[in-house]
Amino acid sequence: MKIHLDRTSSGFCIGVQGTINVAEDKLQELGQLYSYGDVVHNEVEVKRLEALGLVTVDDAGFKQLSNTSVLIRAHGEPPATYTIAAENNLAITDTTCPVVSRLQRTTRLLFQLGYQIIIYGKRVHPEVIGLNGQCDNCALIIKHADLSDPKELEGFEPSAKTALISQTTMDIPGFYELKANLEAYVARVNGSAVEPWMAIRDIDITADMSKVRTMPRYVFKDTICRQVSSRNQKLHDFSLANDVVVFVAGKKSSNGQVLFNICKAANPRTFFIEDIEEINPEWFAAHEGKAVESVGICGATSTPMWHLEKVANYIEATYANSESIIAQ
């Protein structure tokens, strides 16, 4: 049985890796550092950093801090967080992902131009909370691309200027499905023909451009991170190429759930674990009279490579025969 470890489409994305690198450097310098929320949605990595001196605080804990150093993670934060930090004399180490920072600016500018903001994403996701803060927490947040949840449309004004954006880790097909459904919904409510929403670029929404160019009433900007979304097809193909797939991610990881579902759709014998204690020996038993010849190990953008290696080594040592190798 061969163990295939995916090193090209698994492991930290650039944004998360940057946060981890800065956290490690700060911990070496200071000995202790507070993180506002889990530094990454991976419990195993959080515990590793906590052993180095990282202290995770929630909303209540953050508000009680003063005269100390706090890490802002890659997901980003709303403006209110920085206001509290200034009031409490907190030294902020800001590791907001550059992709998220640009999206926050886009959201803020669109709101200033009078657009009601629709975010394709998950209401409780920290990135979405940060985005919503850029527009005074007035955004409509829609998770269901088919508009199956009427509550998500409460407060929507179909005749008003509207801009659709997305949480960076959502799926591309879902975003465009939502756009099409919103176009049809607006036309139906307004009693008009379907009006395609116009794609915009960052340059289109700067203050200077808006003075010389009329902005359309309905616009959208595909803000899904391509470094993340490009992994979809690669992990799909990786899953097809192996008899069994062990997908490693934190249970809180939004990206992990998306990628796991992609792997599972490609290969029904895909199993989700957070750590090696959850591995079931039956996964590697013969299936329909055929022995398992290959096991693929992959994970989310929030899964550290060292942990994927740990899982691969464990499966090799415990379940593979003596002739197996870890293929890279």
From Swiss-Prot:
Classification via CDD domains: lytB_ispH (cd13944)
Coiled-coil regions listed: none
Family stated for the protein in its record: Belongs to the IspH family.
Free-text comment on the cofactor: Binds 1 [4Fe-4S] cluster per subunit.
Protein function: Catalyzes the conversion of 1-hydroxy-2-methyl-2-(E)-butenyl 4-diphosphate (HMBPP) into a mixture of isopentenyl diphosphate (IPP) and dimethylallyl diphosphate (DMAPP). Acts in the terminal step of the DOXP/MEP pathway for isoprenoid precursor biosynthesis.
Binding-site residues for (2E)-4-hydroxy-3-methylbut-2-enyl diphosphate, renumbered to this chain: 41, 75, 125, 168, 253-255, 302
UniProt-listed Enzyme Commission number(s): 1.17.7.4
Species in which this protein is naturally found: Chlorobium chlorochromatii (strain CaD3)
Active site: 127
Reactions catalysed according to its record: isopentenyl diphosphate + 2 oxidized [2Fe-2S]-[ferredoxin] + H2O = (2E)-4-hydroxy-3-methylbut-2-enyl diphosphate + 2 reduced [2Fe-2S]-[ferredoxin] + 2 H(+); dimethylallyl diphosphate + 2 oxidized [2Fe-2S]-[ferredoxin] + H2O = (2E)-4-hydroxy-3-methylbut-2-enyl diphosphate + 2 reduced [2Fe-2S]-[ferredoxin] + 2 H(+)
Keyword annotations of the record: 4Fe-4S, Iron, Iron-sulfur, Isoprene biosynthesis, Metal-binding, Oxidoreductase
Lineage: Bacteria, Pseudomonadati, Chlorobiota, Chlorobiia, Chlorobiales
Gene: ispH
Cofactors required: [4Fe-4S] cluster
Pfam families attached to this UniProt entry: LYTB (PF02401)
Pathways involved: Isoprenoid biosynthesis; dimethylallyl diphosphate biosynthesis; dimethylallyl diphosphate from (2E)-4-hydroxy-3-methylbutenyl diphosphate: step 1/1; Isoprenoid biosynthesis; isopentenyl diphosphate biosynthesis via DXP pathway; isopentenyl diphosphate from 1-deoxy-D-xylulose 5-phosphate: step 6/6
Keyword Iron tagged: yes
Residue positions binding [4Fe-4S] cluster: 13, 97, 225
Protein name: 4-hydroxy-3-methylbut-2-enyl diphosphate reductase
Source organism, top-level taxon: Bacteria
Binding positions (isopentenyl diphosphate): 41, 75, 125, 253-255, 302
GO biological process: dimethylallyl diphosphate biosynthetic process; isopentenyl diphosphate biosynthetic process, methylerythritol 4-phosphate pathway; terpenoid biosynthetic process
Amino acids binding dimethylallyl diphosphate: 41, 75, 125, 253-255, 302
